[in-house]
């Protein structure tokens, strides 16, 4: 009987180690892949908007003056993804949460921080998703979650550029985790934390939160 118990214990330990090594291997592989294939923000349309808006947020504030817009007061001189204010200034149309985070990254790391911001957020996303699924549903659920996210070509392609997808998904996953924990424990502070993550995710990608 003791021999069987020891044998099962060794098998379980070996199984856990294999799962852990597999998870670490996937994370390391996908991290090197996305960091090695990032696209500078000035080479894309939406990523250029988010990158420049982040820089302007630090250097000039959330609004941007436009002499032609102030003089002629017509939308013909309004740039894509920008809105005109009553004072004939321009403000970003969307993604203010990412612009704020991008501005903070730009202050500390300059242009290189904006280059790597979205890939780093993607790496944090897959790690946070794996840990969330593991804590809530077990180690195999965490492994499956990690595989599905790492194999998502759409999420990977969006994350090599300065887009909103990785940050939105990260905030939504964290909000969902605390919401589920609230349902299990009925601790009121968890619903507050969950609401904060959901609220901030709406500043990153409003259309995404509406779809969910």
Task: Say what each PLM segment does.
Residues 85-124, 158-162:
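Loop-to-helix entry region of an early transmembrane alpha helix in multi-pass inner-membrane enzymes
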Residues 169-170, 192-194, 207-212:
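Transmembrane-embedded, aromatic-rich helix segments that form part
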Residues 142-150, 177, 198-202:
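Short helix- or helix-capping micro-motifs
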Residues 56-106:
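Interfacial juxtamembrane loops and adjacent helix segments
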Residues 1-42:
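Start-transfer (signal-anchor) and selected internal transmembrane alpha helices
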Residues 154-168, 207:
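Short acidic/glycine- and proline-prone juxtamembrane loop motifs at membrane-interface regions
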Residues 134-137, 175-191, 201:
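Membrane-interface transmembrane helices that cradle and orient dolichyl/undecaprenyl
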Residues 28-30, 113-137, 170-178:
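Transmembrane-helix motifs of polytopic, lipid-linked glycan transferases
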